[in-house]
Amino acid sequence: MAAITASMVAELRAKTDAPMMECKKALTEADGDMAKAEELLRVKLGNKASKAASRVTAEGVVASFVGGNAGALVELNCETDFVAKNDDFNAFAKQVAELVATKNPVDVAALSALPLDGKTVDEVRLALVGKIGENISIRRFVRFETANKLATYLHGSRIGVMVEYTGADEQVGKDVAMHVAAMKPVSLSADEVPADLIEKERRVAEQKAAESGKPAEIVAKMVDGSVQKFLKEVSLLNQPFVKNDKQTIEQMLKAANAAVQKFALFVVGEGIEKRQDDFAAEVAAQVAAAKQQ
């Protein structure tokens, strides 16, 4: 039996927002397997435990740039929300996004070596670290180059979207980008949803359906129905259009004689765990108290 530590409980709670003792029970049942414990909580607590995908756990900004036939999104991270609002920090993020679009670096290392203001990008970053007093890092970027149209949308500075599309109406591209920011699809179509996400959803659906006590053939239909519902919910073309939920995105595009080729979505801090030392101590104290009861 794996030892369940306070930090493990804290991590699972941060991912799921489930009660601490429920997290401890799930980890115990899963023998310390974090992914399995998260699935157990989803089965037990339903959608409350599905917050992991959208929970923001780090600070920073997303910056965008479109010029000519290329566009880019960049995520620049820092330690606090205060620095994320700093003018110099935001100006650097915009410069980096423009460099990605115009210079087409292959990765963050290549980007960091590009010239900027008489220095390299990394030298400018380090100078900014010294000036501001917080660690700053270029986490990721995406670049589109196309003969089609590009649209970007920034929700504040924490969510960024870029869409490649065709069609005469530029408002369509803007609307789709805004929709992606609001609804956060994981793929363009149901066929493109990653297999591991589908399998994870199927396992959860199977466990929920099995608890219904219904015949096997009914359980199988329940599972298939749950998976199909999931695929529609997370694929862009099948989602109800956020500005008119009587239409799906696919129907809206068809009516506008437009099409979307691909999109990119960045959410600041997605998947990054923020240090929560005080919270871990609180968890440890409550777990210890529970053991004495």
From Swiss-Prot:
Record family assignment: Belongs to the EF-Ts family.
Function in brief: Associates with the EF-Tu.GDP complex and induces the exchange of GDP to GTP. It remains bound to the aminoacyl-tRNA.EF-Tu.GTP complex up to the GTP hydrolysis stage on the ribosome.
Provide the protein name: Elongation factor Ts
**Cross-referenced Pfam families:** EF_TS
Molecular function in Gene Ontology: translation elongation factor activity
Please list where the region (Involved in Mg(2+) ion dislocation from EF-Tu) is annotated.
80-83
HAMAP family xrefs: EF_Ts
Localization, UniProt:
Cytoplasm
Q: Coiled coil where?
A: none
- What's in the keyword line of the UniProt record? Cytoplasm, Elongation factor, Protein biosynthesis
PANTHER family attached to this UniProt entry: ELONGATION FACTOR TS (PTHR11741), ELONGATION FACTOR TS, MITOCHONDRIAL (PTHR11741:SF0)
The record ties this protein, via InterPro entries, to: EF-Ts_dimer_sf, Transl_elong_EFTs/EF1B, Transl_elong_EFTs/EF1B_dimer, Transl_elong_Ts_CS, UBA-like_sf
Tell me the superkingdom of the source.
Bacteria
